[in-house]
């Protein structure tokens, strides 16, 4: 890693930490936390909007990486297992992109940065939900697109609660909740998620 790259990463980590707590914190504070001069932050990112875009790009890459990793949904999964895998896989990076979506919207950066982060996740959920409704695994009270949007909003709310410290979860509780929202009976949802926890390496959670 070059010195410039290492400096950029250090600035991003400081910004992620500080902006996540206070979206209005000064760039001078970010610079101080990263151990660089304020002009160095401007040199790398051009200003606050550029810094937020840098964070969003990094989060988008983390989401893409998670969705292509060993714990991600695979074609052979039944819809309920696929949705559980999806939630559990994204939970570790979800806290990051939830904060950044809020920042991007607050900065008025438009829909593109938000879609960069959520686009791959939305596409995955849309396919899972459509298949789940076709097979009778998920309810059909609302159209697939509406159910997918409801699941997204539900999970972002759970992530907000986790960031605020109102509850703690490693993604398993969130996976159960998502399955229930989709129409899976609570006891079955718990068994699906619990099975993944019990099977260990190579199982539902891809560990």
Predicted segment positions?
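Basic, helix-initiating cap at the start of DNA-binding domains
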Residues: 1-33, 49-53
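Short linear capping/connector segments at secondary-structure termini
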Residues: 69, 102-111, 194-195
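Short hydrophobic/aromatic patch on the recognition helix
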Residues: 35-45
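Hydrophobic alpha-helical connector segments
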Residues: 54, 61, 65-97, 109-113, ...
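Alpha-helical DNA-contacting segments of helix-turn-helix folds
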Residues: 45, 49-59
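Helical hydrophobic small-molecule/effector-binding pocket
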Residues: 77-105, 115-130, 184-188
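C-terminal peripheral helix-coil segments that are non-catalytic and often amphipathic
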Residues: 127-134, 160, 164-207
């Amino acid at each position: 890693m070059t010195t410039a790259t290492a400096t950029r990463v250090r600035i991003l980590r400081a910004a992620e930490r500080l902006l996540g707590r206070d979206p209005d914190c000064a760039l001078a504070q970010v610079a101080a936390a990263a151990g660089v001069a304020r002009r160095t932050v401007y040199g790398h990112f051009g200003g606050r909007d550029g810094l937020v875009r840098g964070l969003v790009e990094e989060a988008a890459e983390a989401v893409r990486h998670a969705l292509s990793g060993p714990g991600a949904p695979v074609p052979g999964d039944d819809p309920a297992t696929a949705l559980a895998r999806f939630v559990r896989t994204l939970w570790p990076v979800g806290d990051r992109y939830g904060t950044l979506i809020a920042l991007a919207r607050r900065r008025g950066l438009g829909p593109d940065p938000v879609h960069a982060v959520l686009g791959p996740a939305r596409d995955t959920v849309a396919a899972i939900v459509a298949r789940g409704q076709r097979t009778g695994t998920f309810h059909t009270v609302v159209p697939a697109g509406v159910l997918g949007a409801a699941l997204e909003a539900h999970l972002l709310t759970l992530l907000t609660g986790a960031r605020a410290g109102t509850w703690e979860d490693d993604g398993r509780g969130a996976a159960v909740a998502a399955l229930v929202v989709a129409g899976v009976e609570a006891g079955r949802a718990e068994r699906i998620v619990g099975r993944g926890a019990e099977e260990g390496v190579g199982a539902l959670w891809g560990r």
